[in-house]
Amino acid sequence: MHYRDLRDFIAALETRGELKRVGQPVSPRLEMTDLCDRTLRAEGPALLFEAPQTGNTRYASPVLGNLFGTPRRVALGMGAENVSALRDIGQLLAMLKEPEPPKGLRDAWDKFPLYKKVLDMAPKTIRRAPVQEVVEEGPEVDLARLPVWHCWPGDVAPLITWGLTVTRGPAKKRQNLGIYRQQVISRNQVIMRWLAHRGGALDFRDWRRTRPGEPFPVSVVLGCDPATILGAVTPVPDTLSEYQFAGLLRGSRTELTQSLGNDLQVPAFAEIVLEGHLSPCEAGFSGVSEHGIPLKEIDGYLHALEGPYGDHTGYYNEQDWFPVFTIDRLTRRPDAIYHSTYTGKPIDEPAVLGVALNEVFVPILQKQFPEIVDFYLPPEGCSYRMAVVSIRKQYAGHAKRVMMGCWSFLRQFMYTKFIVVVDDDIDTRDWKEVMWAITTRMDPVRDTVLVENTPIDYLDFASPVSGLGGKMGMDATNKWPGETDREWGRPIVKDAAVAARVDQLWQTLGL
């Protein structure tokens, strides 16, 4: 089933028993996080809070939380019925990432419908967009009227978490979609927390170089259809826009409308859009925001001190400086739904997303490394800091080649600290088997690869330097000649005929 907007998805989830409406007053300050966290850990439904209230303040917008709280709901959002079907999406992305020339006329004819479908999914623009039915400008913009979550007791301020940020570099036709958290620092300002390698930050870097001193346009979308949301967190090839990929997932072209104050396109059937800019400022400027947050000029633009916030690591992160997004205009539906989430100690909603998107990664890796049988990012490892890879080993040193390949092939794995490589007789998703392989097939000195001074997640306080740290690879495969001089162990295998007889006997024993 495919969904035109967030409301279509909500209705479908409710029909399936995958969404619960909460009519009692619940506060976006701490309470919604606690309720969603308990519900997620119980593998419960999405929650639609219909009466958000903090103290005497009642909010007009209902709040949607725990939307992608189970892998199945992620799959449904991507147009699939179950998580295993996401491998098909991964195969499509693998082909689009590195398309192979047709092997002949028949092969070209077989591939033509797929390429035509991709071309046919270019987004279309409409003028009268539901998301622009209500327009608030200038002094009318007040983020305090939105039920923005204050997720954890130690968080410095309310935080926009599911903002789909739309940017475009000065020399690019394609827009970039990214999801970056945004700290509220005044009625119309937030901090745009994006790391230097992310698409929005790269667009802003190019803008500063080519158009210094000019406001950088940004639009932030809150609450759009699931295909567009998930397209923004999927490793889409550079040749394909996220909007086009969302159309492929949905089975229909993404309907966009131009922002009223800039040339960025946003989903026409979204709930809320924040339009504005990153602000240039005078050299040497320093001050404080309306909410008392330190401000200063960096590279000609206004920045603010962000954090601390509870993060997906399960800890509060360090403070750092990021650019300030000034909101000139807020457009919305008359009865807009505010979509939010939280990040915390795994397993949280981003970790669940990681479990589902793991299935998308596997075919992409297999196209580059056909010897890979499975690839698993355990959610307990923050969904990206540890990977377990099983391979059909073919030569000495093969495991180390796969480690290096995984670290370098997709930018999504740049921050993976630990990679364990096992043989194809080991289930990567069964820790008992992985531990057995590590403890019986590994020598700690011979089979451990340590790499120093590599890019590391900025949030990883365990690294010796912010953004720079080590990586460890563990070769837990059976060793080949050249890797050991010793006779290698022969695994115990049950007699097949005896096992078959015992299978029959087992049914009669009542054990």
Swiss-Prot record:
Active-site residues from the entry: D311 (proton donor)
Q: Where is it found, in Gene Ontology cellular component terms?
A: cytosol; plasma membrane
Name its pathway: Cofactor biosynthesis; ubiquinone biosynthesis
The way it spans or sits in the membrane comes to: Peripheral membrane protein
- Quick check: keyword Membrane in the entry? yes
Q: Which Gene3D superfamilies match?
A: Single helix bin, UbiD C-terminal domain-like
Q: Which domain of life is it from?
A: Bacteria
GO terms in the biological process aspect are: ubiquinone biosynthetic process
Give EC number(s), comma-separated. 4.1.1.98
Quote the Pfam families the UniProt record gives: UbiD (PF01977), UbiD_C (PF20696), UbiD_N (PF20695)
* InterPro entries with a match to the protein in the record: UbiD, UbiD-like_C, UbiD-like_N, UbiD_bacteria, UbiD_Rift_dom
As to how many cofactors bind and how, the note says: Binds 1 prenylated FMN per subunit.
Kindly list the places in or outside the cell where this protein is found, as annotated in its UniProt entry.
Answer: Cell membrane
What positions does the entry give for Mn(2+) binding?
N176, E242
PANTHER family from the UniProt entry: 3-OCTAPRENYL-4-HYDROXYBENZOATE CARBOXY-LYASE-RELATED, FERULIC ACID DECARBOXYLASE 1
State whether it acts alone or in a complex, and with which partners, per the record: Homohexamer.
**What is the purpose of this protein?**
Catalyzes the decarboxylation of 3-octaprenyl-4-hydroxy benzoate to 2-octaprenylphenol, an intermediate step in ubiquinone biosynthesis.
The name on file for this protein is 3-octaprenyl-4-hydroxybenzoate carboxy-lyase
- State the organism named in the record: Laribacter hongkongensis (strain HLHK9)
- Identify the gene encoding this protein: ubiD
